[in-house]
Amino acid sequence: KELGIDYQGYQPVAYYLNGKYQGLMGLRERTNDDFVFHNYGLEEDEIDLVSIKTENISAVAGTLDAYNEMVSYVENHYADSDFYEQLSQRMDIDEYIRWQILEQFVVNTDWPGNNTKIWRKKKGGKFRWIVYDTDFGYGMYEGWSPNYCDASLNMMDFTMGVGDAVNWANGSSNGGGYQFDEKSKWKTTLFYHCMQNEDFQLRFAT
């Protein structure tokens, strides 16, 4: 919470069924339009909420129009002198950077081509990202997929789909190679092209 990023609320709870104790459960906040309403007081028809799930990108609320426009702008104008200023009109840059840093720090390899939710207020709002489902973090499943879940993975390469990461797409031990094949670059293109801009690089580094 102190980082100023949106995240899925979580609370361990004791679970009872018909008065009989069943065990400890993880009670989690939904990351749909209810999340935005309960945290920001905005109704479903006031927001765009985008979901990236495995091979699919969809609008949970509103449309994809503003998101697609933002991605197109980043891909085509990252070298412009006013890029950072224009980007700041489309997204909450500091929140996006903090989201990136957190996901990379925990080595969440089930992301960014999966488990990604992005939202904005339609009227004058900027896109924000929601942290959720980081169970692949910290090399938790390293034994299941050594290359893909290695806690020493270069997450900058992984997140941008460059370097050695592109070679893992053909590895039988890579459970998530879909993030790096040629037809799936749309999943990493936003961060990749943002990082081609010096002003964004500087902000990310500081």
Regions found by a protein language model. Name each.
Residues K1-T206:
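Catalytic-core segments of enzymes that bind and process phosphorylated/nucleotide-bearing substrates
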